[in-house]
Amino acid sequence: MAIRTARTAWSGDLSEGTGDVELVSSGLGTFHVSFPKRAADDADSTTSPEELIGAALSSCYSMELSGLIGKAGGTPGTLEVQADVAFGPDPAGGFHIPGIELTVRGDPEGLDAEEFARLAEEAKTSCPVSKALTGVSITLEASLD
């Protein structure tokens, strides 16, 4: 079983503190985080847990859909996947992720729009990151290029 590691060093309180998220397994870098920028409309060169969740979901989903297209006898071609992860106040208190909008556009060969949409929906529930996010509503828009 593969294990991937990320580590965060945080300093200060929630409203004024800052942190750095390090992608340990890949060594691809360290990224700055802060709560005020996390909650703002403009990220201002700062990442957030929500952006990282979006990256995890969009990459996992594209791999899963590519595999399903191949199993169905198609050729994946290019898939462009975007995950928009919402973050805001929770009516019950604190903050939450109320939902994720997943958009996929592709140009697979050997599939019609109906089959592509069916496989896109299947990938939404079968990719490992989607499974980990079962407590969050994920909507999907799938279209052919």
Residue ranges and their predicted role:
Residues 1-55, 59-145:
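Extended beta-strand/beta-hairpin segments
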